[in-house]
Amino acid sequence: MSFWNTRRILVTGGAGFLGSVIVEKLKEKGCKTISVPRSKDYDLVDNDACKRIYQETKPDIVIHLAAKVGGIGANRNNPGKFFYDNAMMGIQMMEQGRVFGIEKFVALGTICAYPKFTPVPFKEANLWDGYPEETNAPYGLAKKMLLVQAQAYKQQYDFNAIYLLPVNLYGPRDNFDLETSHVIPAIIRKCLESQNSTIETEREINSAQVAISESQSCITIWGTGNPTREFLYVEDAADGIILATEKYNKTDPVNLGSGFEISIKDLVKLIVKLTNFKGKVVWDTSKPDGQPRRRLDTTKAEKEFGFKAKTRLEAGLMQTIEWYMKNKATVVC
């Protein structure tokens, strides 16, 4: 009998980007009872809603994915909201899980929880060696508190909670809203939408400055392009989380990543090639770069529960681009 056959699973954020993939994979594994709460029915910032969700769904295992997330701009403009909502959702859901007596709580952290100048590759032991990059610090610290809570609850209550640290995810169903999206969906959308855009430029004609309209594609990317990032394809991330849920029962945090680091400049070049974008890329150096480098040491995940990412970046990007082109009418905001 499968680990999943008889267990009742609650997946917060289960209708979202990562959550929907996890739910599909759980069904494939034979899980018969999966609850996916919707935000319109359960505001997880409200403790009474957290209590009600346990009473109504009666889960054995909770995979807590619900989060307030966004790119640099969204984090910079809403630091209080990102801190409060993420802290309250996670802390209350874990506490009510303890009170309800669930078998296991799976908490997702974030690479943003690591110190700004962590030695590369990031090892789990480095997590407390400094303050996070300032732009993402409120979000990163809020998620980091779930690790503290998991370890404290194990010590005092013998409560089984694990804490996973994924890198930035990408793939089909990602958030392509330019106000809140992460770097990969934002660049893909900009490249595809700018192919035939018309912009106003100034050109000197007969010694006079006049504004004319010309067909010219141009995309603007924040920062210098020098920082490096690591990305994990959403299908791989879902596999890692499911494996950890089955096999990992320690309170030590575990990284989930691909082990592949790429500069933002090289990432843009790759997406430009894959989207066949022929226009100009402008780097807005007045905007923040964020953390200088990000790459995880993923040896613990492989050792503890056999996880290793399978999808190469270019292949994953191509699948993401193809999905967006087929679905942009329904996902573009």
Where are the predicted features?
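NAD(P)H cofactor-binding loop motif with strongest signal on the N-terminal glycine-rich segment
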Residues: 14
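C-terminal substrate-binding subdomain of Rossmann-fold SDR/epimerase-dehydratase oxidoreductases
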Residues: 17, 23-29, 193-333
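Adenosine-cofactor binding site in Rossmann-like domains, unifying the SAM/SAH pocket
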Residues: 27, 32-52
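Flexible, glycine-rich beta-alpha linker
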Residues: 43, 113-115, 138, 162-183, ...
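NAD(P)H-binding glycine-rich loop region in Rossmannoid oxidoreductase-like domains
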Residues: 48-86, 96
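Short-chain dehydrogenase/reductase
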Residues: 83, 87, 135-147, 177-182, ...
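Conserved Rossmann-fold NAD(P)-dependent oxidoreductase catalytic core, especially the SDR/UDP-sugar
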Residues: 91-136, 162
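Active-site Tyr-X1-5-Lys
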Residues: 134-167, 186-197
